[in-house]
Design a protein with these regions (language model features):
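Polytopic transmembrane helical bundles with strong interfacial aromatic enrichment
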Residues: 2-179
Length: 179
């Protein structure tokens, strides 16, 4: 899932993934303005959206739990890294499912809260790409982490949580207020 050369994450591979991700997200936003769904398809998309939220955010919460457990010295670094690596697939399947089903939910992109949610989704996706590169770097350090690396990990976790919870709250708000 990540481009490694001698245990070091390549900048070119990261840049390619970042550009491809931004292009995919921009395409999804554009498609959401072009597609019009039947009520049955809308309901199916909502179910997929909720299932993807459970899958992706649940996996993120598990990874973050192990990260906090490592900081509190309740679990070894190797176990935290193993969990983070193994949960990459459900995280990215969840994010992909959220974006794909979100296209079919006909978001009101003129609404400021919807625009904020889309910005949060872009931020959490780019933060997720950066988090993958970060865990590769941590693994390459062999368990010896300096303060800047620990600070980067904490910031990654905080950004992740803020984006996921923010997008979740806005989605709930928009749905209950029929925005």
């Amino acid at each position: 899932m990540t481009a490694l050369v001698g245990g070091v994450h390549t900048r070119r591979g990261f840049a390619i993934r970042t550009v491809a991700t931004c292009a995919a997200l921009a395409t999804a936003i554009w498609l959401s303005t072009q597609l019009h769904c039947t009520p049955a398809l809308h309901h199916a998309a909502l179910l997929i959206h909720l299932a993807s939220l459970v899958l992706g955010f649940g996996a993120v919460l598990a990874v973050d739990y192990f990260a906090v457990a490592w900081v509190l010295r309740r679990t070894p670094l190797r176990e935290m890294l193993t969990v983070a690596d193994r949960l990459q697939l459900p995280i990215w399947l969840g994010v992909t499912g959220l974006v794909a089903s979100g296209v079919l939910l006909e978001p009101n992109i003129a609404n400021h809260t919807t625009q904020t949610k889309m910005a949060l989704v872009v931020a959490l996706t780019l933060n997720g790409l950066q988090a993958s590169a970060f865990t590769d770097r941590v693994a390459a350090h062999g368990g010896i982490l300096d303060r800047p690396l620990i600070a980067r990990g904490a910031l990654t976790l905080l950004i992740s949580q803020a984006c996921w919870w923010g997008a979740l709250w806005i989605g709930f708000w928009n749905t209950t207020n029929h925005v």
